[in-house]
Amino acid sequence: MKDKSIKVLEFNKIQEILKNYTCTKAAKDIIEDLKPYDSMYEVREHLEETKEAFKLLITKGAPPFEGVYDIRSGISLAEKGSALLPGQLLKIAAVLRCARRFKEYINHKEEEESYRVLENICEGIFSLPKIEEEIFNAIEGEDEIADRASSTLYNIRRSLKEKNYSVRDKINSLVRSYSSYLQENIYTVRGDRYVLPVKAEHKGAVPGLVHDQSSTGATLFIEPMSLVNLNNEIKELMLKEKAEIERILTVLSAKINANITGVKTDANIVWELDFIFAKAKFASEYNCTCPTINDEGIVDIIEGRHPLIDRREVVPISVKLGEEFTSLMITGPNTGGKTVTLKTVGLIHLMAMSGLMIPARENSVISYFNNVFADIGDEQSIEQSLSTFSSHMKNIVEIMDKADENSLVLFDELGAGTDPTEGAALAISILENLRKRGTKIIATTHYSELKAYALRKEGVENASVEFDVETLRPTYRLLIGIPGKSNAFEISKRLGLPDYIIDFARENISNENIRFEELIQNLQEKSIKAQEDARLAENLKLERDKEKKKYEEKLEGLQKVRDNALIDARREAKNIIKEAKEEADKILKDIRQLERMGYSSDARRKLEEERKKLKDKLDSIEEKEIKTVHKGEALKNVKEGDEVLLASINQKVIVLSKPDNKGDVLVQAGIMKITANIKDLRAAKGSNSNNSSSKIKKSKKLNLNLRRVESSVDLRGMDAEEAIYTVDKYLDEAYLGGLGEVTIVHGKGTGVLRKTIMDMLKGHSHVKKYRLGEYGEGGTGVTVVELK
């Protein structure tokens, strides 16, 4: 495919729009390299993946792309064996989670529609939940490791917390002792060591090590000698903490390295899915459909719209090519939409051949072409000193060298820019040469000679863009089969040019040309009328199909009601039979036990007789239960407002009309109005379901949730709505499980999720109080909740 044609048809602008629907830089890079595929098989497969993603968006909503990142730099470092930063590990885990969730998102029940192409793509996902879980368990945020990352880290931080408490107690005591020598009665920290702000003139009064001074020199920050050992211990613990964190990051990075193939594969699949769903989102936004693809040169675009024109203003066009004719000559006034038609056809083909759904109606047909050539617009080059004609001819020469039967060629104003007679002759020669090769052609022109060429040459068809002489405006509608009529005289007259000048001009045109223009006008009027009639017929057909579908759905609903009623009756009868038989068998078992103990067998024989009678009676219950649907007092007449039983569905209905001469009446069953015959109506005596159900005692069983409840819940990656639901459910379980204190992990981020959770906790019935985590607990990335 020629890059020049892709540029002229503005496919690059479609790529830029597509990028707006992606989540990752990697998917944007895929779109940047997007071009028409090299085979019809590839085109069909990529269109199918777009179509499947489009259906998933409709049926299942947004795909699970929350928190997906471009992790190529992190993968590269892990591949080299480097230790990754906490943020890099978190992003890798997020991508792994997305891949795993996508397999769940795309899964479908046996009776549901499958998604062949997307399922094949997702089959390649490794799913590494263990690594994903370890990373999320160990890392709280971009720069914070969780206490639970290792027992060693937990112990270090616990010791660190205890030492900090000790040193704070000690230094608070020193503040009180040295208060007269201090600038303020506080302590502070310099270089991870606790110090006192001592007035410079009293430095000798506080023995210790000077760590810093204020900008004015009036204050010295002195570490009292009695704190040196405690501060040293804190410093040692902090160094141990740092070393343990580095060890944890190294271990996690090594696990990524050991599974680098799976990580890379999952990441690449996620980015590919990001690209595919960007295509689907574009299709949804621009009301696109999936065309039928062929390699026979057949084109049938139904109400195609140029995607770069404002959707409120664009006028749909319908274009056919390749069956009855292989060349289409479009004529009409300037700014009438001829060039837009060419660009629409060309761009729609590039989109379809790149796996994109197209902005056209259902059942549109696109042909796979090896090449799409476009000579459109004035590309005159000042640097090359080329005229408009020369510039176009340079393009045409290149097209003539490469075009074949598998090419689509788009010419704008072919032969323009030179003497009209020579230009028209040259244009006809070029078109005829390409036509004989089997090339599919759409060309715009002003030349009458090309209109005549299309009329007399088999396989070539005229078309025109409609022009409203009354308003002096183009309608932008394309009329196939009708050459464009010159409107110069009509336009000039409406703009005020004197009649005598127009009449004199008419006298200088041959009678043959006048008759030709009149014939064109007559054909154009008839074509417009025929198209209007066709549109009206299509609308009537759509309306009829809509009504038919509505009544078919009503009929199906009634059938379901009837079937469900019969099923319920059978189920109820079976339950009665089952319970009665079980009771009888239990009594017989007891009698046999009595016999073994020496009691008379008379009771057993009598009970056997009763049991047989009961069995005979119960065996007919199911049939009787179902037959009751059709029994009841027959009705000879009904009136409006009567409540009766509709036997066919065993449901009470309200009579809405008197019987007609056929005995049909209109009745209301629930929210539906249906027609029934009076023979199918019975006198309503009350609900059978209530009576039967009252005879059956149903046992209830209390299910206790005895599973272990975790002491924390992780909300990272969730949106606000999902997080609120998860926390509410978790607090119920924790409360019932007898937990006194729990931790909610929401991460630091922008703080929106944290605020949402805190707002929810304020009025929660199980919450006694809550606070943000302290150092070592997760800081502002967690909320600690005390339960009632």
From Swiss-Prot:
Every Smr domain range: 713-788
**The enzyme's E.C. designation:** 3.1.-.-, 3.6.4.-
Q: Which GO terms describe its biological process?
A: mismatch repair; negative regulation of DNA recombination; rescue of stalled ribosome
Q: Which residue pairs form cystines in this protein? A: none
Q: Using the UniProt record, name the top-level EC class of this enzyme in a single word.
A: hydrolase
One GO term in the molecular function aspect is: endonuclease activity
Q: Name one Pfam family in it.
A: MutS_V
Q: Does the keyword Cytoplasm apply?
A: no
- Record InterPro entries: DNA_mismatch_repair_MutS_C (IPR000432), DNA_mismatch_repair_MutS_core (IPR007696), DNA_mismatch_repair_MutS_sf (IPR036187), MSSS (IPR046893), MutS (IPR045076), MutS2 (IPR005747), P-loop_NTPase (IPR027417), Smr_dom (IPR002625)
What PROSITE patterns does UniProt report for this protein, alphabetically? DNA_MISMATCH_REPAIR_2, SMR
Q: Any idea which UniProt keywords this protein has?
A: ATP-binding, DNA-binding, Endonuclease, Hydrolase, Nuclease, Nucleotide-binding, RNA-binding, rRNA-binding
Q: Where does ATP bind?
A: G332, P333, N334, T335, G336, G337, K338, T339
Quote the function comment for this protein: Endonuclease that is involved in the suppression of homologous recombination and thus may have a key role in the control of bacterial genetic diversity.
Q: How does it assemble?
A: Homodimer. Binds to stalled ribosomes, contacting rRNA.
The family this protein is said to belong to: Belongs to the DNA mismatch repair MutS family. MutS2 subfamily.
NCBIfam families to which the protein is assigned, alphabetical = mutS2 (TIGR01069)
Protein name per UniProt: Endonuclease MutS2
- Lineage in the entry? Bacteria, Bacillati, Bacillota, Clostridia, Eubacteriales
Name of the gene encoding the protein in the UniProt record: mutS2
